[in-house]
């Protein structure tokens, strides 16, 4: 017979060697150490005993006399005798005398009290099969009711057959329930099927009064019946009793605990409680329930072969071969492995072989995904999860049914100071340019005018180089672009940039040649300059209209408007006002009393007060709509510019706005988009190549100026941020630690104080009294500006002060060596005449011979007429001795100089 060591059993069962040796000694096995071996059968008994505290029925310790298993047989139906069986007991307990009675096939057994037999109708019996272990009840489990176990000197276990006594048959006739023959043997329980679970407090007694002593009738001893392994189940598991009663259990003997003796029940409950406490202590000592610590099963014994490896239970992997897979753009190593049905180890191994050090949680780059796809023979296609969250695409997929003509949206673009806003003012008869600081536009403004009964929407963009993003947004949100060029100034850099934005957006373009009232105006020069960048005038055979105008006198304004309306008519601009609104955000800000405010232009549909809208990751319900003249309205139609109030945050300028049905819909979609953005930020792997590492080290060595930027509108904030990020060189840079739309707050001051040497830059915002006071207390500098030029100049000056000064050399004097004198223990003294500048003592000096620098040191001694001199001026003679140098010859030139620090600027 195969034998197995104690230590192998302990590992398999999840127990300690010491604990298992103790249990083995209790069972009487000859075990002394962890390498002691026992048979496979004994191993199964030992593990069952160590884990559940139970022993197989009929188990005898080595050297113990075998005990007979007592099998009870039911009496003939007419025999009014109660059969009592004694359990298999330990050697200390003498077995009770039993009597064997021949079995009859049609007998049924029923659990009931004496009172139930007389007073109630017979109930259908439920049969369960259990195994009755021969161990003490100290480790048995009680759920709904006590589990039947055989305990030392236990009394009250009885076999109840159908009673034939006269008192049981008075007034009632017991109906025999039908049974199916059970193919397996075991101990069965017959009890009444009950509709609801009955707890341990339920009376299960054999009489209606005081506890009755167990029956003293003798039964004959019979040969022990062979015991087959059966399934252990809870005999009081009422859930399993609620199904089909006739579930395959045959008519066999029935063993029940006689709970009429309360001492038995109480003793069982005490032992059960003790067992549970011990189990909890073991779990606590092991740091929680031991994984895999299950009762030892016979089928597990196969893995306990002596000298062999333990069987490893591995998760069965699918053998499905994947040839094509769709993965998100940002995918981790383990996610890719799952998609292609490979292990993480295989994926990491391939990348490791190519010199890529990755872990399972690292994100894969596009190149790495291509390499892996080729290696595993999988066709990989990437998908953008944001496509599912694209509310604009979902809006566009719905067909417009009631199309109507809409006003054109015109964007005015061009170089700074070329008269864009003044031209728009003339059209609107307003004075917007006067209100802008410095006379330059620093915001995107949208206005609507009427010409010949038709409305035209104008969008004004800044011309300053810092406002590139604003011009790009203006081109995207428009139908026609007007490029304003000053006739006296010609084509400038921002003019070319505006034309590039317009062409990129695929928008029609009209050239307005402004300032035609000036004598220096030269329209032909403009046409020739624009022709060089493929913008050919219509009268030169091109496709672009050139309209001469003057914002000062009003010359050509009507011609310009008619050209716009003609172009719009050719474009057949239409929209469906019956649909929900779709708009584009041209500017956003925070206004006191209103919160986040977005300036939008409706592209399609109608926007109403109360509509639920989404703008990128921002959402809200429209609370108010204000037109460009300040009037409030309830709704606005296509191509109408307006300011809306009611969003939860300041939206990004250039974002698309779409109205939806419910608040829940917009909120969930916005939150999902925000979550995606966060995940995208996290997708940037922290792994860095050697080149990246060098760049990071160099970046860390840069001196930085920490700044906090606060602006009145989102567009200006973006412009300032973009300009400041460009202010850097190999030594200094601007570190933007915080940015926001709105006024300077106390929290901004606190943040600046926490950041060393941080400066708060406010654009078109002013700090309040309390903020000023706190800034003064904490020593935080708050600088406010209304013109972007001034802000950038100040930051440049601050960065210049942080840069290391440039060391320049300034020559202070020259002296020619006329004669040399050698003095013992002193050195060589050069007799010189100062030919230029002033020679000073202790100044730096270099010896030049035939135009070549021979030595560089400093003047250690300067004398005139044997007296020490502090300096010798041009034309005078003197004696000079250089420090640590004596090889001076006649004709040499001694030149003195000093280092001068010069502050640099960006």
Curated annotation (Swiss-Prot):
Its main location: cytoplasm. It comes from Sulfurovum sp. (strain NBC37-1). GO terms for cellular component: cytosol. Residues 94-125, 165-232, 270-321 are annotated as: Disordered. Residues 299-313 have a biased composition (Basic residues). Belongs to the TRAFAC class translation factor GTPase superfamily. Classic translation factor GTPase family. IF-2 subfamily. Residues 460-463 are annotated as: G3. Residues 405-574 form the tr-type G domain. Residues 514-517 are annotated as: G4. It is found in: Cytoplasm. GTP binds at residues 414-421, 460-464, 514-517. Residues 550-552 are annotated as: G5. One of its GO terms (molecular function) is GTPase activity. One of the essential components for the initiation of protein synthesis. Protects formylmethionyl-tRNA from spontaneous hydrolysis and promotes its binding to the 30S ribosomal subunits. Also involved in the hydrolysis of GTP during the formation of the 70S ribosomal complex. This is Translation initiation factor IF-2. The keyword Ribosomal protein does not apply. It comes from the Bacteria. Residues 439-443 are annotated as: G2. Residues 414-421 are annotated as: G1. Residues 165-176, 222-232, 270-284 have a biased composition (Basic and acidic residues). SUPFAM superfamilies: Initiation factor IF2/eIF5b, domain 3, P-loop containing nucleoside triphosphate hydrolases, Translation proteins. Keywords: Cytoplasm, GTP-binding, Initiation factor, Nucleotide-binding, Protein biosynthesis.
């Amino acid at each position: 017979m195969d034998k197995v060591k104690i230590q192998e059993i302990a590992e398999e069962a999840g127990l300690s060697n010491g604990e298992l040796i103790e249990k083995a000694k209790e069972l009487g096995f000859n075990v002394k150490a962890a390498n002691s071996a026992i048979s496979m059968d004994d191993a199964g008994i030992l593990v069952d005993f160590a884990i559940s505290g139970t022993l197989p029925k009929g188990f005898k310790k080595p050297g113990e006399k075998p005990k007979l298993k007592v099998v009870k047989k039911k009496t003939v139906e007419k025999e009014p005798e109660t059969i009592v069986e004694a359990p298999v007991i330990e050697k200390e307990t003498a077995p009770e005398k039993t009597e064997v009675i021949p079995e009859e096939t049609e007998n049924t057994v029923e659990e009931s009290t004496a009172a139930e037999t007389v007073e109630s109708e017979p109930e259908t019996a439920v049969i369960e099969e259990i195994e009755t272990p021969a161990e003490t009840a100290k480790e048995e489990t009680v759920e709904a009711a006590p589990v039947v176990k055989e305990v030392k000197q236990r009394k009250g276990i009885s076999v109840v057959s159908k009673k034939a006594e006269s008192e049981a048959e008075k007034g009632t006739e017991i109906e025999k329930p039908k049974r199916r023959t059970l193919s397996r043997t075991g101990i069965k329980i017959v009890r009444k099927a009950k509709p609801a679970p009955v707890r341990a407090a339920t009376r299960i007694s054999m009489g209606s009064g005081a506890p009755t002593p167990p029956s003293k009738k003798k039964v004959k001893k019979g040969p022990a019946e062979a015991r087959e392994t059966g399934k252990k189940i809870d005999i009081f598991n009422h859930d399993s009793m609620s199904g089909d009663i006739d579930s395959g259990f045959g008519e066999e003997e029935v063993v029940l605990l006689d709970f009429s003796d309360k001492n038995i029940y109480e003793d069982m409950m005490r032992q059960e409680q003790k067992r549970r406490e011990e189990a909890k202590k073991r779990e606590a000592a092991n740091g929680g329930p031991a994984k895999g610590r299950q009762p030892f099963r016979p089928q597990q014994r196969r893995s306990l072969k002596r000298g062999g490896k333990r069987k490893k239970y591995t998760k069965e992997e699918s053998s499905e071969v994947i040839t094509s897979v769709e993965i998100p753009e940002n995918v981790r190593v383990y996610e890719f492995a799952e998609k292609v049905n490979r292990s993480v180890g295989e994926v990491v191994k391939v990348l490791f072989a190519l010199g890529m050090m990755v872990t399972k949680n690292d994100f894969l780059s596009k190149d790495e995904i291509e390499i892996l796809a080729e290696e595993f023979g999988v066709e990989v296609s990437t998908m953008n999860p944001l496509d599912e969250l694209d509310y604009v695409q979902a809006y566009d997929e719905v067909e417009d049914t009631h199309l109507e003509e809409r006003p054109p949206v015109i964007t005015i673009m061009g170089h700074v100071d070329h008269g864009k806003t003044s031209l728009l003012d003339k059209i609107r008869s307003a004075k917007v340019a006067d209100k802008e600081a410095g006379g330059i536009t620093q915001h995107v403004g949208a206005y609507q005018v009427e010409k010949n009964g038709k409305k035209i929407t104008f969008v004004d963009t800044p011309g300053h180089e810092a406002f590139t993003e604003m011009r790009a947004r203006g081109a995207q949100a428009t139908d026609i672009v007007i490029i304003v060029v000053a006739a006296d100034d010609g084509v400038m850099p921002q003019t070319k940039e505006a034309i590039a934005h317009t062409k990129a957006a695929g928008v029609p373009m009209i050239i307005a040649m402004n300032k035609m009232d000036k004598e220096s105006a030269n329209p032909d020069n403009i046409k020739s300059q624009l022709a060089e960048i493929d913008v050919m005038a219509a009268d030169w055979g091109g496709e672009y209209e050139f309209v001469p105008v003057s914002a000062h006198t009003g010359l050509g304004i009507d011609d310009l408007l008619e050209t716009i309306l003609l172009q719009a008519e050719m474009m057949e601009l239409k929209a469906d006002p019956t649909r929900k609104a779709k708009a584009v955000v041209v500017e956003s800000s925070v206004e006191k009393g209103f919160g986040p405010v977005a300036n939008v232009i409706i592209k399609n549909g109608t926007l109403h007060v109360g509509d639920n809208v989404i703008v990128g990751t921002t959402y809200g319900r429209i609370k108010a709509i204000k037109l460009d003249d300040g009037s409030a309205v309830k709704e606005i139609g296509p191509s109408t510019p307006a300011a809306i109030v009611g969003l939860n945050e300041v939206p990004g300028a250039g974002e698309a706005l779409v109205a939806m049905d419910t608040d829940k819909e917009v909120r969930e979609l916005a939150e999902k988009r925000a979550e995606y953005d966060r995940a995208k930020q996290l997708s940037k792997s922290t792994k860095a190549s050697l080149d990246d590492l060098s760049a990071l080290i160099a970046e860390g060595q840069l001196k930085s100026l920490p700044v906090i930027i606060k602006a009145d509108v989102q567009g200006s904030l973006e412009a300032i941020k973009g300009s400041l990020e460009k202010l850097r060189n190999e030594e200094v840079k601007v570190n933007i630690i915080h940015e926001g739309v709105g006024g300077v707050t106390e929290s901004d001051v606190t943040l600046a104080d926490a950041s060393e040497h941080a400066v708060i830059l406010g654009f078109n915002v002013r700090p309040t009294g309390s903020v000023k006071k706190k800034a003064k207390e904490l020593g935080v500098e708050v600088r406010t500006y209304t013109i972007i030029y001034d802000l950038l100049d100040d930051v440049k000056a601050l960065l210049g002060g942080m840069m290391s000064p440039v060391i320049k050399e300034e020559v202070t004097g020259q002296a020619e060596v006329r004669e040399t004198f050698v003095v013992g223990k002193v050195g060589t003294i050069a007799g010189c005449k100062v030919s230029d500048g002033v020679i000073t003592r202790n100044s730096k000096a270099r010896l030049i011979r035939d135009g070549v620098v021979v030595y560089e040191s400093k003047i250690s001694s300067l004398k005139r007429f044997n007296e020490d001199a502090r300096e010798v001026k041009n034309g005078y003679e003197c004696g000079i001795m250089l420090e640590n140098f004596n090889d001076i010859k006649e004709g040499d030139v001694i030149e003195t100089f000093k280092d001068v620090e010069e502050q640099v600027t960006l």
